[in-house]
Every structure is written in C-alpha cells, then in structure tokens.
Amino acid sequence: AKKIILTGGLWSREIAKKIGIDLPLYACEHYYVVTEAMAELTQRPVMRDFDKGIYFKEDAGKMLIGWFETNAVGCPMSRITKDFSFDEFPVDMEHIEPHLVAAMETFPVIGETGIRTFFNGPESFTNDNLHLLGPTPEIDNFYVACGMNSKGIAAAGGLGKIFADWIVDGYPSGEITETDVRRNNSVQTTQSYIEARIPEALGHTYAMHWPFYQYHTARNLWQSPLHDTLLEQGACFGEVGGFERPNWFARDGAEAKYEYSYNRQNWFKFYAAEHLAVRQSVGVYDISSFGKFEVSGTGSLATLQRLSCADIDVEPGKVVYTQWLNNRGGIEADLTIARLDDKRFYVITGIASLKRDWSRLNKNIQPDTQTRDISMELACLSVQGPNSRHVLQKITDADLKNIEFKFGTGRFVYIGDSQIWMQRLSYVGELGWELFVPASDAVTVFKTLQQAGEEYKLCNVGLHALNSLRLEKGFRHWGHDIAAEDNLVQAGLGFIAKPDAGDFIGREAFLMAKAKG
C-alpha cells in the first residue's frame, strides 16, 4: 500500500511501536451499567450530567448509564491478552458505588428498576482528551486515527470524511490542528508519562474546562535551567508540550497557585503589573521552552530557502521572520531564522510546534545539510521594554545603540564569562533583545541581569503577559491565530514572502492567493 492508516484502537500504541512510533495512548477501565427494561423509556434523548460526570442513554428499552470518574484505573497492556475481544474485567463494586448512587439521585427510577448488566472493559484515552490524527513524523505516508476517548461513534462520520479527503487529495478537509498527532513531544509519549497523565485526563472529560487549567500528574519533566530560581521568585508554572513555563509571578505574599474561574482569575492583578512593566519600563521572561534547531553545512541555505517564504540568503548576523508553507500556500510553521555565518543557522519555534517543525525540516533537507535539535542546550531570556537597552548595556561591551545594533540583527557577545547569541527582536512590540545562553550559564547570567535591572525595576514576566502583549501588538501565534488552513494573504502576512528569492514550497499557491487579493 502507498498509504497506511492505523486504526487499531487501544492496540495502536503497541502496533506503532513495532515500527518506531510512540503514541501517547493508554487504556483505562471504563464502566457502564444497563438497567432492567423500562416501559416508559422510548425514544429518549441522550442526557449528560456534567456535575456528576455521568451520561444516560436508551438501550433497547433499557437505560445505559456510564461515567468518567476522576479516579480512573489504568489498564496496562499486560492485562489485555492478544485474543481479548469484547471481553470484560471484573467489576469493582466499591469503585463504582458512588457513581451508581449519583445516577439514582438524578433518576430515582433506576433504584426501583434494578441493574441488569454491569460492564467493565478497557478503552483507550489520550493525554489531553483529544484524538490522535494525521501523518506521523517518523514514517512518510503512515497515518493514525486513534485515541477516540470514548467518542468514537460521535466522531466516526467526520473522521471518515476527513481521512478520505486526506488520502485522495493529500490534505484534510477540515481544520484539525488540535488533534494533530505531531503535537506531542517525545517526553509525552513515554510509558511512565502516559500511565500517570491519561487516567487524570479521562477524569477531566466531564469536568469544567477552566481557562488555563493545568493537569497535576506527569509534571516537571522538561524544565528550564532557571526553573528553581524562578520558583523561588514566585513563578506559577504551566505545562505546554511537556515543558514547564512560568505563566505568572505571585507577589506580596500570595500563593503561586491557580484559582480557576471564568471571571478574572486570582493571578490577573499580578499579570497586569507584568504587562505594564514591559510597556512602561522593562521586563524579562524565560522563553527557554522555545524549540531551537541548528542547521549547518554547505546545503543549509538551500534547505532553509526551500522551506521558507522569506529570503534567508541574508548577511551573517541577520535574523529573518518567516513562515513555512504547504503546497496549497497554507501556513505550516511561523518562526524566526538567524544566520550565524555562511553555513550555520538557528531556527527558533514554539514548544507546541517543536516536533512537527523538526519533522518538516528534516523531511525537506537538501544534500550536505546537518541538523541538530539544541532546544535543551540553550536557555533563552527575552528582555523587553523601553529601558531594556539601559539594563543590557550595563552587562555587555557590545554597543546597543540603534545604529550599531539594528532591529533584526544578532551577534555573539559576552556577559561575564559566558558567550551568548544576542538578537534584537521583539514578540511584544517593544525595544528588546533575546539572549540565547548555554544552559550551564543561565542562572549566572540571569542573576547578573537582575542586578543590572534593579535601577529600572526589572520585572519578572510570565507567558500570560507575553500573550496579551503580542495580541495588543497584533502579532500572530501559530495554532491559535493562524494554521495550515490559512494562507499568508488571509493572515495579513503577505509582505513576508519574497517570491523572487527562490522556489519555496507553496510559492505558486501564494502568488495565486495574492492575485485574488
């Protein structure tokens, strides 16, 4: 077969592992019960009680009752034999009793009618309650469609159409960025991770989906070199792509802990102060979570020129903002590329896009090109705000005046004994620089920076403020504002493309979109 779709249900992880693919898929015990017949139960709609995590539906004149418990029991594959087919696990009455009692509170008739069937079987779930769909980064033309999270029947029709179009046309007929199998980084596919995280995710199915909700299990797997230092300074961390990032900083004796609400949450006043500090003076945020790739060799320019819609053939020391497009002109990646010298580049992308961008880079590699994922080798500090130059000039001999250190340029400089790559860029629309620091030197450089910033009240800034600052400026974020279904013209980014620079992927589609306006 030219193309293969893996639809192996809870066996998909084991099947995929045989060919070197790790899927964050894990089975848990999943219960339902069926009552005795109810004469009055005909043509009733499905009902869900989200407060209790229970669903009710008619089943041939009887009522089927299922639930998604917060204390789900994981089910390792050792419990599921090779000939396991429509089989069952023993029923733990003590485990399910609270759910049965809750169901009877909603429908007292259940207690009067009685239970005819108790069922307990394995069902597969994912680490974030979203499907695993699409082409795998490891093997060309190998697709997966699994991780239905007990929603397989509801999703079947739509998924069938999406995959039929995908196989025939080469791309999906709907926007499925959230469910892209490439969203999970390597640390999110280990056995220890899925055994810890997925039972919690199952219990979140019917829970209130609070803004900025953070899971509790399988945390602190990838950390910035500054993690402990920032924790001591009040950081409240959130996890994206398996990486712990400081989202906001507690002050004035407050606890660095989320209190969830659909109104302004408890961190709003702290975040607002961070936002204003960047606009009015200077702030520093740890963006070490960003993906960082080194591309080198005599073919490195050809590789990046083929992928990028912007012109990457710039002088060493220039930094280019660009997109990587698909053949339809859709935006597959939104990133920056710094040219260090004639044959070496840094590619900087977001943590949530790390795996898909790394895959896209290596699948389009030209001869005589070497790539390295250096994401964990370098920490990154972004110093932003009108006073950023004053602070940074204290700790480096580099001349930071406009005429000497222009926007969109970078160079290697020293801060103390540490050589760092320093580039003048801003994702928040202020004067600022990004400092790429060897991980081993990160704490020392950070403390030096803080001392230099005392005069200007240098403020620790979290990712919540970074997001609102970039929104205020109108900067795009891949996966939220733009994705593979959007072209440059629709996104207001047509000025980035330089079609005269070379035959980049998506060039013809871009020119057609530009002509249409």
Model-derived regions: residue spans:
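Short Gly/Pro-enriched turn/cap motifs at secondary-structure boundaries
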Residues: 23-27, 44-48, 54, 114, ...
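Acidic/polar loop patches that form or flank catalytic/metal-binding clefts of enzymes
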Residues: 23-27, 43-45, 110-116, 170-178, ...
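C-terminal catalytic lobe of FAD-dependent flavoproteins
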Residues: 51, 60, 82-83, 87-223
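Buried hydrophobic packing segments
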Residues: 12, 159-167, 304, 449
